Amino acid sequence: MSNVCTIAWIYGRVQGVGFRYTTQHEAQRLGLTGYAKNMDDGSVEVVACGDEAQVEKLIKWLKEGGPRSARVDKILTEPHSPHETLTDFSIRY
């Protein structure tokens, strides 16, 4: 498999419920780099880079609702070319 980067915007009850923290934990478990960031519109932006199959697993996990305390109503994804080198998976503020 090849390495890819995907950017996702997750909408629903995804802020104030530990969404970024649990996304970081899941991404690290899958060996991915990138970040999770709360957006002003109430969504969460996630950039995930790594092995294509592992990125797909994270996106599937996000679509299934992520952490139990969250409620995902909609997720949009597209290929992404980061403007920086991502060496780990972080929470951004």
UniProtKB/Swiss-Prot annotation:
Domain Acylphosphatase-like per the UniProt entry, residue ranges: 5-93
Reactions it catalyzes: an acyl phosphate + H2O = a carboxylate + phosphate + H(+)
Keywords: Disulfide bond, Hydrolase
GO function term, MF aspect, one: acylphosphatase activity
Active site: R20, N38
EC number per UniProt: 3.6.1.7
Record-annotated disulphide pairs: C5-C49
InterPro entries: Acylphosphatase, Acylphosphatase-like_dom, Acylphosphatase-like_dom_sf, Acylphosphatase_bac, Acylphosphatase_CS
Similarity-based family: Belongs to the acylphosphatase family.
Protein name from the UniProt record: Acylphosphatase
Species assigned in the record: Salmonella arizonae (strain ATCC BAA-731 / CDC346-86 / RSK2980)
Gene: yccX
